[in-house]
């Protein structure tokens, strides 16, 4: 990966970035209104409908008790990983090409974690009783099982949110100061508070670099451990096709894979609609394309190992569960996942494809569609076909 693709003056960069914040035209408000309308129609209206009619409105049944909510939770947790994780790795390796992308990638981490937390609230069904799950003294004597992987999730994800927030905020302090010096009114007051009196002295830069590097080293194993713990929600059960020791690396690789694809999508949007073509260049897409190729090969290898060991073990439950996933009711989704996540990314072997913006956009979207399908298949197929035939059933998401 080559050097800095942006030999531009910092003054020009600051002016362009600040202009995108303070100079909001009609296009900005149209985009904001569209995003809010889609959120209202696609999320809040269905959620209110579910709150009124019950969790069955989402198609929940027996044995499909997790449905798309758990799949969505895993997907958004995974999508959050590459933002901070990739930024930490590139910072430690001193890769200068990260400068044009790392702040937006880190912002994707925070938004993805917020959406993942919202998926938990939706899945509860009756969120006004969510305090029953908290470990506080009460007359119902309902106590969380501290040995449960679900409680591991809460601790790990809370720690990851805290660490990522501190990491992103610390790196943004000089940016807040740059915006502070170029704004007036309430914006100046807000960014003055956020910048903590940053002046840009050598001493401040030295301390910031030391603390930023320390957090980067800390967050890398933290991010890996978070998705490993999420995988234990499944791997520590005795359900066929879930009780696998390979689930931790499988989930971690999948999380980095989907997160990297998400970064490609975000980078395209910033380049196209915010006129950052000078800063987000072919070099960024080229390097991200190489990373997608490597991750797709790792992901494909783990899938091959999972299928091979499942059939090679000779365990009837595992064999039946894998056969059902490959050739049963959900088989079209499985082969769609393989096509989007294992076959199409091979196009990244060609530099002409990696440096083409629109094809890379469609590939990144296809990869995340495939990765969401993977999470859905993990949840749906494993619960649909267990040991006893009288426990078999189908889960189909409601419209």
Identify what each model region corresponds to:
Residues 359-369:
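Central hydrophobic cores of alpha-helical transmembrane segments
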Residues 332-357:
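Extended C-terminal subregions enriched in glycine
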Residues 66-67, 101, 240-251, 323, ...:
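Non-cytosolic membrane-interface motifs at loop->transmembrane helix junctions
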Residues 2-8, 48-58, 62-66, 73-202, ...:
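Transmembrane-helix bundle segments that line or gate the permeation/cavity pathway
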Residues 15-19, 112, 340-347:
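Hydrophobic, membrane-inserted alpha-helices
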Residues 1-24:
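Short, Lys/Arg-rich, polar N-terminal cytosolic tail immediately upstream
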Residues 43-49, 117-127, 302-309, 371-380:
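C-terminal TM-helix exit segments that contain a strictly Trp-centered aromatic cap at the helix terminus
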Residues 19-23, 27-47, 138-337:
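Long, contiguous internal "core" modules enriched in hydrophobic/ aromatic residues
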């Amino acid at each position: 990966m080559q050097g800095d693709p942006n030999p531009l003056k910092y003054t020009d960069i600051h002016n362009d970035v600040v202009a995108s914040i303070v100079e909001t035209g009609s296009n900005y408000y149209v985009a904001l209104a569209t995003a809010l309308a889609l959120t209202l129609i696609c999320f809040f209206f269905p959620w209110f409908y579910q709150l009124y009619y019950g969790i069955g409105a989402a198609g929940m049944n027996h044995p499909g008790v997790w449905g798309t909510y758990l799949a969505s939770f895993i997907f958004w947790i995974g999508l959050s990983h590459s933002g901070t994780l990739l930024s930490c790795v590139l910072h430690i390796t001193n890769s200068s090409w990260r400068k044009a992308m790392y702040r937006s990638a880190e912002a994707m981490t925070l938004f993805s974690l917020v959406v993942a937390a919202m998926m938990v609230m939706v899945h509860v069904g009756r969120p006004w009783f969510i305090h029953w799950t908290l470990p506080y003294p009460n007359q119902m004597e309902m106590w969380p099982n501290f040995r449960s992987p679900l409680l591991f999730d809460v601790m790990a994800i809370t720690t990851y949110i805290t660490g990522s927030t501190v990491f992103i905020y610390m790196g943004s302090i000089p940016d807040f100061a740059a915006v502070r010096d170029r704004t007036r009114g309430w914006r100046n007051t807000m960014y003055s508070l956020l910048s903590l009196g940053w002046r840009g002295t050598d001493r401040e830069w030295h301390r910031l670099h030391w603390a930023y590097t320390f957090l980067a080293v800390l967050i890398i194993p933290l991010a890996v451990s978070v998705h490993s713990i999420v995988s234990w929600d499944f791997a520590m059960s005795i359900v066929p096709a879930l009780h696998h020791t390979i689930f931790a690396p499988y989930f971690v690789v999948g999380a980095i894979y989907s997160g990297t694809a998400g970064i490609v999508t975000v980078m395209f949007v910033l380049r196209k609609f915010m006129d950052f073509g000078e800063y987000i260049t072919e070099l960024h897409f080229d390097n991200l394309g190489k990373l997608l190729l490597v991750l797709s090969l790792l992901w494909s290898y783990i899938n091959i190992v999972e299928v091979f060991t499942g059939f090679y073990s000779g365990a009837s439950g595992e064999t039946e569960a894998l056969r059902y996933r490959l050739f049963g009711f959900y088989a079209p989704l499985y082969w769609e996942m393989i096509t989007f996540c294992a076959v199409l990314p091979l196009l990244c072997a060609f530099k002409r494809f990696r440096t083409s913006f629109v094809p890379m956009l469609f590939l990144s979207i296809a990869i995340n569609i495939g990765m969401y399908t993977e999470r859905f298949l993990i949840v749906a197929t494993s619960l649909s076909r267990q040991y006893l035939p009288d426990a078999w059933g189908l889960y189909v998401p409601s419209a």
